[in-house]
Design a protein with these regions (language model features):
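Class I S-adenosyl-L-methionine-dependent methyltransferase catalytic core
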Residues: 1-78, 85-100, 111-298
Length: 298
């Protein structure tokens, strides 16, 4: 197994017994029990139903996201590259297109250690392993939704994101692809991303039929490791490889760029790491941040 993928598996506590194909949640053995814990069961016994669902989740104890083998990742990237998507129309793009997000959510485990300002450790993983928050999320699955599969992993993951406030978000890959194709309708165009983040733009832009040359700058050592892994997967899946540069955008000088597009940090609203290359560490006040980071980057 690839060493980076093994690190990812270790972070998510994935064991061989959890792997149920190239794309899995780990909860496949209890799906039939989830099916019996439907809305009528909840209406009859809310507290008991929530407890039964909670016990099933704790019996496996994996954060309820989609997991992949390496072949599963390659297949998922190919599927992402081939599906239809909403383009920019009248300078607008529709909301809600989350295709590709599960790939980044799985690979970029350090998204789980980033902290919204003032919230401390409150990631999806933290919430899942907090019994009270998990039970609140399960209750939300029933009280706010109708239909089937109310307590399946996707539903519980979405409910956990509603529990106790802010979430560190990744840029939607489909939006990145649509926006860059709108701004830069140039085959093999050079697209500069001055704040790579968790791979949403790399995945979206790298999957475009325009075959862009993606150039991305990112200071975070751990994030760069996962960006390089995603870059390798893109090369294998669709034959496109970007350029990942570990540097700070205020110092890096790009050349021959057709389009610059990114989603930079907003001073200290989110903490990604304690490395001295982080702009919130380098620049201690908002004025210093504007003059030292924002203006040179632009």
């Amino acid at each position: 197994m690839n060493l980076v993928l093994q690190e990812i598996y270790n972070f998510w506590n994935i064991q061989n017994s959890n792997i149920r194909g190239d794309e899995f949640t780990g909860y496949e053995p209890v799906y039939d029990q989830f099916d019996t814990l439907d809305k009528p069961a909840y209406n009859k016994d809310p507290e008991g139903t929530v407890q039964k669902v909670f016990d099933l989740y704790r019996s496996i104890n994996l954060v309820p996201i989609v997991y992949y083998t390496e072949q599963g990742l390659i297949r998922a990237i190919r599927d992402f590259a081939s599906i239809g998507y909403n383009s920019v129309k009248d300078n607008k793009i529709s909301l809600g297109n989350n295709k590709g997000q599960p790939i980044s959510r799985f690979i970029f485990t350090n998204m789980m250690t980033a902290e919204p300002k003032g919230r401390g450790h409150n990631s999806l993983k933290d919430r899942f392993y907090d019994d009270k928050k998990l039970k609140r999320a399960i209750n939300l699955c029933y009280s706010m939704r109708e239909g089937n599969k109310l307590c399946y992993p996707t539903a519980v993951r979405r409910a956990l994101e509603l529990v106790t406030g802010e979430n560190v978000q990744n840029f939607k890959p489909q939006h990145a692809r649509s926006i860059v194709e709108h701004l830069c309708p140039v085959l093999w165009g050079n697209v500069y991303d001055y704040s790579c983040g968790y791979g949403g733009r790399l995945l979206g832009i790298g999957s475009s039929n325009m075959k862009y040359n993606y150039i991305g700058v990112e200071p975070n050592t751990e994030t760069v490791k996962y960006l390089n892994y995603l870059n390798d997967l893109l090369d294998e899946a669709v034959g496109v490889r970007g350029t990942i540069i570990q540097d700070v955008s205020e110092d890096y000088q790009p050349t021959d760029i057709d389009c610059a597009f990114s989603s930079p940090p907003y001073f200290n609203l989110e903490k990604y790491s304690d490395e001295d290359t982080q702009c919130m560490v380098r620049y201690r006040t908002l004025d210093e941040w504007f003059s030292g980071y924002a203006e040179p980057t632009i």
